[in-house]
């Protein structure tokens, strides 16, 4: 609009100047009239054009999806828009944000929590409190448990999808062009490499569950197109999630105006249930130029992998140490940072075995050079030492925990996948510019019914007063 007004001003000034030049000198206007013609009148026309143009500009309506180029600089990173996590250690009444902090040892139950008073031994420390999918009698197959997990992890997002205008994904606004629907959502999924769960069958289970929960292709009032989810499976072990995460970032870079999900699931101790080794995670991601109209929970750079075989033996420096140093340098550089910026480490070295000690020693040796005061025990979190062998769910569970730590402590967190002796896997999670840091003295939101059970963690909208929300509530 400003450019148009400037053009109008210049054209009017030129016309007035030419008109004045062609008049006989004896008939020329007085000086004040010349000023009117050469300056004031063009300004008036320019102002009118500015105002009238502004009247025709579209204004974003509540719920409208705006696509604004944010022009992020530097290496490609993804915004974390939302996180959902299920594990038998989770209490269904506290939100996902609290669950992650509770697991990290950073949050506590509310003062006067009835369950803590009633059963202090069970609810005062991180331990299984209830099964997500019950398998009494151990009769349910691995794929059946997977199917039920998909229903449970999607339901908290689906509850608000239809009926809540403020939900990130919603079909509530009157006009479908203002929807942000889940038809065609791209999903990168890490699952265990087990014969009981074929990747093609698993992908179909996920597609069917998403279609059912969000009524894709159903009534026109709930779905504008019959496009099934685009689900891609990666079957593997503890590092499979890094592969899925890398694929999701590739997709977002190629599709800057879309969102993507990165998911994982495993139940390594099946047919046993209520085990903390069970994890199901959804990371809702968007590219750096996607206007979510929310503050990011954190930023994720590209995962990197460095193979031990690609390095030569050096005196006093094993190839594994070289590979890990290269991986950490690449992971931090991919986030526009350096290795000296690492403020916390989340890893899967485990405990109680010689191999766990070697993993910790390697990580400590690499970090002690650039960060001589870094204490891997006090500045690190050994997830599998607490939860057990979490299988294919390891990498993305660690990323979810890293998002919580980076958000609330304001430091970059390195996630290290140590289980492959022949490769170093790493990714850096960076804190957001505007976090909502929890206050230990404040009461956490708790669900009073199924409507808010297993409440996901979403970045808060930029257009609302955050003070109106209870701590831990987001939608």
Regions found by a protein language model. Name each.
Residues 1-277, 281-475:
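Conserved "HGTGT" condensation-loop signature of ketosynthase/thiolase-family condensing enzymes
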């Amino acid at each position: 609009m400003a450019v148009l007004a400037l053009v109008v001003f210049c054209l009017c000034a030129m016309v007035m100047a030419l008109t004045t030049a062609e008049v006989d000198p004896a008939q020329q206007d007085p000086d004040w009239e010349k000023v009117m013609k050469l300056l004031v009148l063009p300004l008036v026309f320019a102002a009118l054009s500015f105002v009238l143009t502004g009247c025709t500009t579209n204004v974003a309506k509540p719920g409208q999806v705006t696509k604004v180029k944010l022009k992020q600089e530097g290496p490609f990173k993804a915004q974390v828009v939302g996180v959902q996590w299920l594990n038998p250690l989770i209490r269904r009444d506290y939100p996902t944000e609290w669950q992650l902090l509770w697991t990290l040892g950073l949050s506590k139950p509310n003062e006067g929590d009835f369950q803590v008073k009633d059963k202090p031994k069970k609810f005062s420390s991180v331990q299984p409190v209830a099964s997500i999918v019950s398998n009494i009698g151990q009769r349910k197959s691995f794929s059946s448990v997977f199917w039920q997990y998909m229903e449970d992890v999607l339901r908290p997002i689906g509850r608000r999808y239809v009926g809540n205008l403020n939900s990130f994904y919603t079909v509530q606004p009157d006009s479908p062009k203002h929807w942000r629907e889940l038809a065609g959502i791209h999903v990168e999924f890490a699952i265990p490499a087990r014969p009981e769960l074929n990747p093609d069958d698993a992908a179909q289970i996920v597609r069917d569950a998403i279609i059912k929960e969000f009524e894709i292709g159903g009534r026109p009032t709930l779905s504008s197109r019959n496009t099934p989810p685009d689900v891609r499976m990666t079957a593997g072990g503890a590092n499979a999630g890094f592969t899925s995460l890398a694929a999701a970032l590739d997709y977002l870079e190629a599709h800057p105006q879309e969102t993507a999900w990165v998911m994982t699931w495993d139940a390594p101790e099946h047919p046993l249930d209520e085990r903390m080794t069970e994890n199901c995670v959804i990371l809702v991601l968007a590219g750096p130029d996607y206007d979510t109209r929310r503050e990011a929970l954190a930023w994720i750079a590209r995962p990197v992998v460095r193979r031990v075989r690609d390095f030569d033996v050096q005196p006093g420096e094993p190839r594994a140490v070289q590979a890990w140093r290269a991986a950490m340098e690449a992971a931090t550089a991919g986030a526009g940072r350096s290795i000296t910026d690492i403020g916390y480490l989340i890893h899967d070295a485990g405990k109680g075995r010689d191999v766990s000690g070697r993993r910790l020693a390697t990580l400590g040796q690499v970090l002690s050079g650039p960060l001589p005061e870094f204490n891997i025990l006090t500045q690190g979190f050994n997830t599998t030492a607490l939860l057990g062998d979490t299988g294919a769910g390891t990498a993305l569970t660690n990323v979810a925990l890293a998002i919580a730590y980076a958000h609330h402590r304001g430091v970059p967190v390195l996630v290290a996948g140590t289980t492959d002796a022949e490769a170093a896997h790493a990714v850096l999670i960076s804190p957001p510019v505007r976090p909502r840091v929890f206050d230990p003295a404040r009461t956490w939101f708790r669900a009073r019914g199924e409507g808010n059970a297993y409440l996901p963690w979403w970045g808060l909208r930029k257009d609302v007063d955050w003070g109106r929300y209870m701590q831990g509530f987001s939608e």
